[in-house]
A protein has these predicted regions:
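Primarily recognizes the serine-hydrolase "nucleophile elbow" in alpha/beta-hydrolase
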Residues: 48-110
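Alpha/beta-hydrolase-fold catalytic nucleophile elbow
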Residues: 16, 69-71, 92-95, 116, ...
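Serine-hydrolase catalytic machinery in alpha/beta-hydrolase-like enzymes
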Residues: 1-61, 156-165
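C-terminal catalytic histidine-bearing segment of alpha/beta-hydrolase fold enzymes
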Residues: 137-166
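Short alpha-helix in the alpha/beta-hydrolase fold that links the catalytic acid
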Residues: 125-135
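Short beta-strand/loop motif that positions the catalytic acidic residue
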Residues: 109, 115-117, 121
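Acidic beta-to-alpha connecting loop that harbors the catalytic carboxylate
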Residues: 119-122, 150-152
Length: 166
């Protein structure tokens, strides 16, 4: 996706949040990797913010609006980054775990938020979407959510379900 964004004329940064170019070999392996990183919310947010600040300091990003876009763990990371007060134009979470957002965090969000999840996702319960709606109610945050019917996890990657079943 990063190459595709660059081809469209954007400056892009792809972040390896697991480290060492690790890719999940199955859904179970992916969930284990996800759990290892996400156990400490403050650490997760600090890491995301550190990457953002380094990216923002690059000459090619000066004067540009920046959005954080991610799939699954990356989507969750985009929402966590928005909660740090990073000056983002937008944060997009595609089939990602949806974090709780406190009132203090909501006050720090400058980004417009877009969350897109599958209604039949076995990994991200629909209750998370409802909870996010409650967390952001009356907060002043510009947010939209799409819950796609009869759609499972990793809907942006049709091969993911096949890879996870091997």
């Amino acid at each position: 996706w990063g190459r595709r964004l660059v081809e469209e004329g954007y400056v892009a940064l792809c972040v390896d949040m697991f480290g060492n170019a690790t890719q999940a070999e199955s859904l179970e392996h992916g969930l284990r990797l996800f759990g290892e990183v996400t156990q400490d919310r403050e650490l997760w947010q600090r890491r995301a913010r550190r990457v953002f600040d380094a990216f923002r300091a690059r000459p090619e990003t000066q004067g540009c609006e920046i959005a954080a876009i991610g799939f699954c763990f990356g989507g969750s990371s985009a929402l966590h980054l928005a909660c740090t007060g990073a000056q983002l134009a937008g944060a997009v979470c595609l089939h990602g775990d949806i974090p709780r957002i406190s009132g203090e965090e909501a006050k720090a969000i400058s980004a417009s938020l877009l969350v897109c999840n599958g209604a039949a996702d076995p990994v991200v319960p629909n209750e998370q979407a409802l909870t996010l709606a409650q967390d952001l109610k009356g907060s002043g945050v510009d947010w939209q959510m799409l819950l796609l019917g009869e759609t499972g996890h990793s809907f942006t990657n049709p091969d993911a379900a096949r890879a996870g079943s091997r």
